[in-house]
Amino acid sequence: MPLKLRGKKKAKSKETAGLVEGEPTGAGGGSLSASRAPARRLVFHAQLAHGSATGRVEGFSSIQELYAQIAGAFEISPSEILYCTLNTPKIDMERLLGGQLGLEDFIFAHVKGIEKEVNVYKSEDSLGLTITDNGVGYAFIKRIKDGGVIDSVKTICVGDHIESINGENIVGWRHYDVAKKLKELKKEELFTMKLIEPKKAFEIELRSKAGKSSGEKIGCGRATLRLRSKGPATVEEMPSETKAKAIEKIDDVLELYMGIRDIDLATTMFEAGKDKVNPDEFAVALDETLGDFAFPDEFVFDVWGVIGDAKRRGL
């Protein structure tokens, strides 16, 4: 069925359409649970993170389809959406929408705001930042390390989308390709990044570094909608505490070796190894599932160690 904002509204510009009209602005409000969706008809509520009325989205099976529905509900282009957070309009990297969506989660879409171009002097081999992406072609900064090269450039913030590096457009690149590009930049040389920060409400916020805790927290004990790149979305139970901790540890290994965080990739790796009996079988499974990554042997062994620990604790 076509998506629309709740209630009748007159046509508005993008600027005035952001006014909240009689709907709660976050989780816990009355409308979030007012109409529980019947079987096979899952309805989610959404807002633009900088402020808007509440929209309803349903019937999507992938991140791309979800973005298209959110865009239709708010009369914007899907390409305007940088990423979404769950149950908070803040730029909270621990609340990013990935491949799993709780059935009662409230979606906040962060859209393009101010463009900026920054020059960075690469004084160290490591820039001190972690990259992730939204699954549909936009890479952005998930974490900035205290005291690192990027930390010294105060105009660069967590949540900024990286549009180009030294004039090369990287829209459509996956996070690992962007991280590799940045890593390969020559030391002791200046480089330029074009960034787009998410549009913000009229409030003053401190520059966020996203903390030192793990990425998106994987909850336990409730149902979730699992979005897939191929095939229909499925409703699943949230993982056990042991499995959730193992996936977060794999995400830590991804950050250590590749400079990225991706809870969905970590989940895929865990699923590929949970029924394997040795690291050789696991390596073969990774090649079959994620062959494009060409993971080094030491990385595979570290991930296998995490999975082995989880097995010993009981999944």
UniProtKB/Swiss-Prot annotation:
Start-end of Basic residues biased regions: 1-12
Localisation: Cytoplasm
Region span, Disordered: 1-34
Keyword Cytoplasm among UniProt keywords: yes
Subunit structure, as described in the record: Probably interacts with SEMA5A.
Species whose genome carries this gene: Homo sapiens (Human)
Tissue: Expressed at highest levels in ascending colon and at moderate levels in adult kidney. Expressed at low levels in adult pancreas and at very low levels in adult liver. Expression is down-regulated in several primary tumors, such as kidney, colon and rectal tumors.
Pfam family, one: PDZ
Every PDZ domain range: 117-197
InterPro entries reported for this sequence: GH2_GIPC, GIPC1-3_GH1, GIPC1/2/3, PDZ, PDZ_sf
Protein name as annotated: PDZ domain-containing protein GIPC2
SMART domains xref list: PDZ
Recorded family membership: Belongs to the GIPC family.
Stored PANTHER family: PDZ DOMAIN-CONTAINING PROTEIN GIPC2, RGS-GAIP INTERACTING PROTEIN GIPC
PROSITE patterns from the UniProt entry: PDZ
GO MF annotation list: identical protein binding
One CC-aspect GO term: cytoplasm
Record keywords: Cytoplasm
Gene3D superfamilies, A to Z: 2.30.42.10
